[in-house]
Amino acid sequence: LENTNHNYTIVQGELGTKLFLQTLMNQTSVCFDTETTGIDALNAELVGMSFSWSKGEAYYVPFSENRDEAQALVEKFKPFFESETIEKIGQNIKYDLKILSNYGVSIKGKLFDTMIAHYLINPDMRHNMDVLSETYLKYTPKSIEELIGKKGKNQKSMRDVALEDIKEYAAEDADVTYQLKQHFGPILDKAETKKLFDEIEIPLVPVLAAMELEGINLDVPFLKEMSVEMAKESAALEQKIYETAGEKFNLASPKQLGDILFDKLKIGGTKQKKTKTGQYATGEEILSYLANDHPIVKDILDWRQMVKLQSTYIDALPNQVDKKTGRVHTDYMQTVAATGRLSSNNPNLQNIPIRTERGRLIRKAFIARDENYTLVSADYSQIELRIIAALSGEENMIKAFQNNEDIHKSTAAKVFNVPLEEVTKEQRSHAKTVNFGIIYGVSAFGLSNQTSLSRKESAELIDAYYQTYPKLKSYMSAQVDFARENGYVQTVLGRRRYLKDINSANMMVKSGAERNAVNAPIQGSAADIIKIAMINIHKKLTSENWKSKMLLQVHDELVFDVHHSELESIKPMIKHEMETAIAMDVPLEVELGEGKNWLEAH
């Protein structure tokens, strides 16, 4: 900053603010940024706001520590924020939306988020402002650490920083973000992702902000009970493992565990994988592969799962309840998963394990607002399979979906060449594994690991599968060819996934990119579809003044807090909006459930 021409001004006093507002209201496109007392938007207070609408020029408006005075100043800026004609630019603008919402301001008009723009341009890169500025503007902004120090107990608050220093830092943020917008706008147009940006990603920002501010109710006493139970169970299992091993050892130490399993108990023969440091590898993948070789392996996997559940969810969730609201507020991130799917943090809802009984129980802790509300879960049924059927134009699969057949049973009947009514449970289960595995490039080796089939039987099953659905095979090859030629693949709505390794000389790396060439358009299309549904449902809930709220989005599922008086009218609305989010040759199907808690509803 010191070596760059810039003109940053502090806006103060009644007259200064009035004159500034007159100029501000005459602009058509303005970048703004809030400076606050912390990163938790629910509890942070405004320290200041910066604005920029021209390169090298920016303004900083400081806010009083007195809440009433700060609120009075915010009110003066309401006409700007609520103007439909002025475009507002920001970097991670969802945070600013949440801060302003706490001051009773709802932002209207067109939005532009540089972080999201860059995510669509280059999903695999980092998207924070400093990186973007250095990469695209060849300019290094002041770091927050220069102002308040490193994270930790000695870190200062923004309130403690001298006005002149905070002005330079905050105004620079707005200036840099404004310049990034000028840079990214044309690139978005060229990459043909502007429609996705304008119609899905940007309209989704206020939807996610509303969901995050709403939060969800948590049954803390239930989790405390579960914690005591889980501690007992894992301690008992630990003792059992020591008895089987014939000695006590540190279960959490991969080295000690490797020595016990492979030197002492000689599990899995002599060819055991070692890490760079020379100790045995004991990761989940390796142990899962050996699970049938010795009972101790299954117990160790079980014990690990219990310990992880307890530390990551059962004991952590109660600490994530906000003191002010008494609810848990997850943070949704739009710019992390390269496929276009949302991810979440604090808590990470996407990773709550649902394949095991214990993992599913954690959902029981998420409960309705009070006795007047019920949780409703709406889940897309087999959305990825429906998408690949539509994209590949595979008639056999499309017909099965159109006739509302059980797709796994229907696949089994065709693959094993038996009448539909004679398909066994086991045949259906094998067909299901292939159906879901095929888009992730499942191999005969992988299939035999997941089922009771031998490798030879698995290879035969995969061959029969491709003969049953020949267009799937040709679609998958065409996707890989397209990626080889263009360096990217795209979703139904034009979301791109760049695959720089698609022509790599390294076979492992190349086959990973080939798998992505097939599954990125499918996962990404599923992500686009649920995002459209969320935008449309949110629009209805707010414009029609429903009491019910949308709370969570996890994978292909949406969770709502529904007022009893609205239960029967909201369910068909949700189902309709989700099933008609996008028109395809294959019908989308949504399953609805309801209950006092998320487990019951799902």
Task: Annotate the PLM regions.
Residues 156-159, 206, 213, 322-330, ...:
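Conserved catalytic core of nucleic-acid polymerases
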Residues 101-111, 125-130, 394-398:
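A short alpha->loop->secondary-structure connector
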Residues 250-252, 549-554:
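Short beta-strand
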